[in-house]
Regions:
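The canonical Cys-X-X-Cys-His
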Residues: 154-165
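Extracellular beta-sheet/turn segments enriched in Thr/Pro/Gly and aliphatic residues
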Residues: 109-134
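Structural motif
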Residues: 44-53, 86
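Conserved beta-strand positions in repeat-built beta-propeller and related beta-rich domains
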Residues: 289-295, 331, 336-344, 372-374, ...
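A short, solvent-exposed loop/turn motif at the edges and junctions
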Residues: 63-66, 88-107
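Short, acidic Ser/Thr/Gly-rich low-complexity loop/linker segments typical of extracellular
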Residues: 63-80
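Blade-level signature of beta-propeller repeat domains, shared across WD40, Kelch, NHL, RCC1
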Residues: 536-573
């Protein structure tokens, strides 16, 4: 059934100061700047312990602005912000370098006339625990490999919603942890993301989820599901329970970025609502970024030229029902598609026309993930839709296939990608297979990922019909060539990286992956296997990577789900 209507709109012009004013007068600089250009601010980062320091993330935020620009110091300790990225004004400066704090508050005045200079002195930190990523906690904590695997190698682990620091700083006993683990199971995971800077929010699940949590003695899923009591007893040995004021293990850290990993500019824009939990984004042909909220009934856009956000409200759902939407897909006509939740835990496929602001829905097409296929077809899970007529053309499935391999099998929540022949493929996160369906015959086929129990997750199909995907518990990036039916895998630099989402290759052939455990964006050169890890300036969790279609220099966009920010990454090499 096709329904149409309209949504109400809220314009949210965020505090960008002169940038927004300039945009209104037609004089604003494009925040998608095409070339770094001359420096607005430069300096040297050093410490008494190391001298000039490489790999220190330096952050600059103008007073009153809603965005922060970050660069990384080079091998000589030098950092530089291009003038294209910093307007004149007073800026606060902060750093990220594990083991160090900035000596005193950092600030600088930037003018249009000359390059400002600010040398930064760092001191050894007195609170190393507050600086550790979840991966560094995993490296540090005591326990057997089996205990750590059961804690971390879960498709929805503690670090899916917050960092492991929260667990390690707790003082819960084993008995208290059992009740706490049960309470955590009552939250809707994709609608919950809580950062240490008080952004994001927790979202309770549906009543049936809450009831199931009370009855379930297990935390996690097979094959690594663990009895809550067993996990609770382990966690009570590594937190601050029993009157401990420090941890019974050495805190270990990752090396800071070096070489190519320092050649990047990262800009993060605060979303209007600090409690937004945005799962996905997609750019349209003009570069405008569209996003959804996983736990609120609205969707929005950000204009990268001005940094201004606009929100569009959606019909509410009854109390007790889950609100929000997950994936979002822009079609070839710049219409916006997303799965919207409705009363009774239902989902309807929704199309928004930005020109007319008309909303159309297709009932009976419910899924969580979207894809764009050949000829511009919209895919909602295994269902193919003609975007012009909004008619369902076909719906496929694999569950009744006669050739299903021995289980268990669990497709990753209706995620599909589509090759040039119009055939859909999906990761089987439970069985570690790639599932493909011939769109002409409806026949399903299964290919086992070379690494067992690798939990294949989100990815993209490229123009050569290669499906690039994350191996979440395999700590690898995988590629399945749908033409040759061959796999290739590339390992991450270290265990417990747990890559979540993988991009298609960029114009230089590089592939990117997100890691909420390491709080780094990973770049892979598939030809050599070389990996570059870009340090994200804040906590980091992103579910999808998109390329900007309008910039001459490579630009990646992501939603930082953990901190409710839109994030732009510009590799400089």
């Amino acid at each position: 059934m096709l329904e149409t209507g309209r949504v109400s709109k809220r314009f949210l012009t965020i505090a960008l100061g002169s940038l927004v004013v300039g945009a209104m007068s037609g004089a604003s600089r494009d925040l998608r700047a095409q070339s770094p250009g001359p420096a607005a601010l430069s300096g040297v980062v050093s410490s008494q312990q190391e001298g000039n320091m490489e790999g220190v993330v330096v952050n600059a935020r103008r007073d009153g602005a809603n965005f922060t620009v970050s660069v990384v110091s080079d091998a000589q300790g030098k950092y530089s912000f291009p003038r294209t990225h910093l307007e004149p004004g007073k800026y606060g400066l902060t750093i990220r370098a594990v083991g160090y704090d900035l000596s005193g508050p950092g600030s600088v005045e930037i003018t249009a006339a000359k390059t400002a200079s600010a040398d930064l002195k760092l001191d050894k930190t007195n609170n190393l625990a507050a600086q550790l990523s979840s991966l560094e906690w995993a490296m540090s904590i005591s326990g057997t490999p089996e205990q750590k695997d059961k804690l971390i190698y879960q498709t929805v682990s503690c670090a899916y919603c917050h960092t492991l620091e929260r667990v390690m700083r707790s003082k819960h006993t084993a008995d208290e942890f059992v009740a706490l683990i049960t309470r955590m199971q009552t939250y809707y995971t994709d609608g919950s993301a809580v950062s240490t800077d008080q952004r994001g929010r927790g979202q309770k699940g549906m009543p049936d989820q809450v009831a199931a949590a009370e009855q379930n003695p297990i935390w996690g899923r097979e094959p690594l599901g663990v009895p809550k009591k067993e996990l609770a007893e382990y966690l009570a040995t590594v937190n601050l329970s029993g009157g401990r004021t420090t941890w019974p293990f050495e805190l270990k850290t990752l090396p800071r970025p070096k070489g190519n990993a320092t050649r990047v500019i990262i800009t993060q824009y605060d979303m209007p609502r600090a409690d937004t939990v945005s799962h996905d984004l997609d750019p349209d042909s003009t570069g405008t970024l569209w996003y959804t909220d996983e736990s609120r009934m609205f969707f929005g856009k950000m204009d990268p030229k001005t940094g201004a956000f606009t929100e569009y409200s959606l019909p509410s759902v009854p109390p007790g029902d889950l609100p929000g939407a997950r994936d979002i897909q822009v079609d070839r006509d710049d219409n916006i598609w997303f799965p919207r939740r409705i009363a009774g835990a239902g989902i309807v496929l929704t199309r928004f026309n930005p020109k007319t602001e008309e909303v159309s829905t297709i009932e009976g097409v419910g899924t969580q993930f979207m894809a764009l296929g050949p000829e511009g077809k919209i895919w909602a899970g295994w269902t193919r839709v003609d975007p012009k007529t909004m008619k369902v053309e076909a719906t496929y499935g694999w569950e009744k296939s006669p050739n299903i391999p021995p289980g268990p099998h669990r497709q990753y929540v209706d995620l599909t990608v589509v090759n040039s022949k119009g055939n859909p493929y999906a990761p089987d996160i439970g069985g570690s297979y790639i599932i493909g369906i011939d769109a002409m015959t409806g026949q399903a086929k299964f290919w086992q990922v070379p690494t067992p129990r690798s939990s294949p997750r989100r990815g993209r199909m490229d123009a050569q019909d290669r499906f690039w995907f994350a191996e979440y518990t395999g700590d690898k990036i995988g590629m399945f060539d749908t033409r040759t039916e061959k796999f290739q895998e590339w390992p991450m630099l270290r265990k417990y990286t747990t890559p979540y989402a993988v991009s298609a290759p960029d114009r230089n052939g590089y592939v990117y992956a997100t890691s909420n455990m390491s709080e780094r964006l990973i770049r892979l050169d598939p030809k050599t296997g070389a990996i570059v890890e870009y340090q994200i300036p804040t906590e980091f969790d992103s579910k999808k990577i998109a390329y900007d279609p309008t910039t001459s220099r490579l630009t990646l966009w992501m939603v930082n789900t953990r901190t409710a920010r839109m994030m732009k990454v510009e590799p400089l090499d």
